């Protein structure tokens, strides 16, 4: 795999007339005794100034495809695709913060696994869910409470949050790792860019609706009933404010870069990296989104997110993930539909088309990769 990645870089350097210089600069790093004999006396490995990193341009056909898909969709949409191996990125509106909704569960789990790597918490830490922990909307764990209590673990909460998008599981995990402050600190420490973590599920959803949160809203459909009683202008003002400046906003390019760092092992230990990607590959949500265009032999580790609806508009319809080809090459993909009135099938089709274009590009490059190898 290292050889194939080098071949891509070598071709790019050759086109720029830099291949000989790059090869000379790389030679002292080899462990070949013949090269060592040619080094000057007193040479210290790594003493030379660092070479400037060569940026491989994004493939023009894929740039054209992504621009066309997003430009023809309408609404507020950001898409980013990054080659985890070559490093290039294709993005359209990639720097515009979009409502994350449940995509933000990824940052909570990353924070938890980071603390596990530090020895501060464990996957097997016992935790208790009570009625005071319940949130709203999708929370299947609520049905497991017996006499108002359910005993669980960090491991189960991660699984439920990441594969079922269980809001209560995520919020309980969030509290265990130190709340939004801890998550935002993780994002900042790892320089993940334009990614904000909001106040948690209850405050996020109540503010988007124009309500002040009450724990009674966690029971049954109490939240929906209270929301329906609000004057239309109150709901619309809150909805528009959230879409314009989402408190959980994240840019598609920043998410793609973060997923790239995850896949490269730059965020977590090898064990935690493998564990999280495995959990994300077993996700049960969004079968008609990115996953619908994943061919046999390919793998997708992903997280979806979906916001509230108001008068035919949706604030956040997202899917982000790591798409891995049979040959091991991988791409970080983020499709963030911040606001749209397009039908659900159209939104899903946009996501499917993005994956289809990435796969088509990858397959079109296969003959060149084989020749280079």
Regions found by a protein language model. Give the residues of each.
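Bacterial N-terminal signal peptides
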Residues: 14-22
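Structured C-terminal helix/loop/strand segments within mature extracytoplasmic catalytic/sensor domains
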Residues: 2-7, 11, 27-69, 180, ...
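A short small-residue
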Residues: 88, 146, 237-239, 335-337
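Active-site-proximal helix/loop microenvironment
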Residues: 194-271
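Active-site-adjacent loops and short helices of periplasmic peptidoglycan-processing enzymes
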Residues: 31-212
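Short, motif-level signal for alpha-helix interfacial/capping segments enriched in acidic residues
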Residues: 82-84, 229, 284
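Hydrophobic membrane-targeting alpha-helices
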Residues: 21-28, 115
